Curated annotation (Swiss-Prot):
PANTHER family: RIBULOSE BISPHOSPHATE CARBOXYLASE SMALL CHAIN 1, CHLOROPLASTIC (PTHR31262), RIBULOSE BISPHOSPHATE CARBOXYLASE SMALL SUBUNIT 1A, CHLOROPLASTIC-RELATED (PTHR31262:SF10). The lineage of its organism: Eukaryota, Viridiplantae, Streptophyta, Embryophyta, Tracheophyta. The keyword DNA-binding does not apply. Keywords: Calvin cycle, Carbon dioxide fixation, Chloroplast, Photorespiration, Photosynthesis, Plastid, Transit peptide. RuBisCO catalyzes two reactions: the carboxylation of D-ribulose 1,5-bisphosphate, the primary event in carbon dioxide fixation, as well as the oxidative fragmentation of the pentose substrate. Both reactions occur simultaneously and in competition at the same active site. Although the small subunit is not catalytic it is essential for maximal activity. This is Ribulose bisphosphate carboxylase small subunit, chloroplastic 3. GO terms for cellular component: chloroplast. The basic functional RuBisCO is composed of a large chain homodimer in a 'head-to-tail' conformation. In form I RuBisCO this homodimer is arranged in a barrel-like tetramer with the small subunits forming a tetrameric 'cap' on each end of the 'barrel'. One of its GO terms (molecular function) is ribulose-bisphosphate carboxylase activity. Residues 1-58 form a transit peptide.
């Protein structure tokens, strides 16, 4: 008997609590009128106030479509000088990335036999020797690139900065192109 009285009192308490919680939320009365928000209108002006690059439109061509292949980030620049190349390699060494040399005789991505990427479609280049773990001298990387160029004179050669902690390629740029 006592247990049924306790159950009845808890149901009554729950019934009293429900209406109190429902009345705490204000009812939806609709959206506010547009007059409550001030609207600022820009003065109507001519096209002379629009931003313009002037006569430089002729200079916006990015690259010719015939005879000049483009690859990684720095391929739109002229061929790197030895000093510029050393600075780029020193940058990747300073960031703790492992220099690695790769080469490709074609230097072009083509998917002739399959639509999914694979080893022989040009996306993956052949590694020159092993990655240069522990390398702290940019001149050593340039020397290896020259050795690769001597072995494969008709190849594209690139340097990759590989982060061995995150297991990702962080930087990649062409150092040698075939003549």
């Amino acid at each position: 008997m006592a247990s049924s009285a306790t159950m009845l009192s808890s149901v009554a308490t729950a019934a009293r609590a429900a209406p109190a919680q429902a009345s705490m939320v204000a009812p939806f009365v609709g959206l506010k009128s547009a007059s409550a928000f001030p609207v600022t209108q820009k003065p109507a002006t001519g096209l002379s106030t629009l931003p313009s690059n002037g006569g430089r439109v002729q200079c916006m061509k990015v690259w010719p479509i015939v005879g000049l292949k483009k690859f990684e980030t720095l391929s739109y620049l002229p061929t790197l000088s030895v000093e510029s190349l050393l600075k780029q390699i020193e940058y990747l060494i300073r960031n703790g990335w492992v220099p690695c040399l790769e080469f490709s005789l074609e230097g072009f991505v083509s998917r002739d036999n399959n639509k999914s990427p694979g080893y022989y479609d040009g996306r993956y280049w052949t590694m020159w020797k092993l990655p240069m773990f522990g390398c702290t001298d940019a001149a050593q990387v340039v020397k290896e690139a020259a050795e690769c160029k001597k072995e494969y004179p008709a190849a594209f050669i690139r340097v990759i900065g590989f982060d061995n902690v995150r297991q990702v390629q962080c930087v990649s740029f062409i150092v040698e192109k075939p003549e």
